[in-house]
Amino acid sequence: MILSDQNFLQTQWKEPQTAQSKNTESKCEFHGNSNEVKPIGSLNGQSIAQCRIHTGKTVPIVKGGEQARMEENEIYAIETFGSTGKGYFHDDMETSHYMKNFELADEKIPLRLQKSKGLLKLIDKNFATLAFCRCWIDRLEETKYLMALKDRWMAMVGACILQSFAGKIIGKRANLLLNLII
């Protein structure tokens, strides 16, 4: 969404009550059980740019978040996440997804091993600088890169070629993560 309405531009994201009340009041039925859906307050919408997410500003889905102003011609991904778990995301767990470092998007990256080069080429072709998880490499049926993944993955993170993001929804074993439309 590109914003250009001057009245809307003056709005601060102080209290996004609609998102919070919709999340808090929601229930979902799963396998015959009714579950309360709680907002995951630490997962926010964010400003985005072409082939780049997380460009600086966030849009909270619960009260008390960051108070930033939207500027004209900025683009945002407004995401409202809810969970049947405890309603928070623990980000110091094992890595859940990766992104290629945007600053290196157009640079030739010197890698010594052929499998590492092949893995990076696969990432460039299929994901560029957008987020992906390791199982998506499996789904591409690129089994020849599985050893490179295991052996070279953390080396690529350590060399700042890939950024790693960790996290897990906290709660019951069978949590549901819902991306709610409000």
UniProtKB/Swiss-Prot annotation:
Keywords assigned by UniProt, alphabetized: Aminopeptidase, Cobalt, Hydrolase, Protease
Entry's Gene Ontology cellular component terms: cytoplasm
GO biological process: proteolysis
UniProt-annotated stretches for the region Disordered: 1-33
UniProt entry tagged with the keyword Hydrolase: yes
InterPro entries documented for this protein: Creatinase/aminopeptidase-like, Met_Aminopeptidase_Type2, WH-like_DNA-bd_sf, WH_DNA-bd_sf
Polar residues composition bias: residue spans: 1-23
UniProt-recorded Gene Ontology molecular function terms: aminopeptidase activity; metalloexopeptidase activity
Leader sequence segment: none
PANTHER family: METHIONINE AMINOPEPTIDASE 2
Family: Belongs to the peptidase M24 family.
Name of this chain's protein: Putative uncharacterized protein T27A8.3
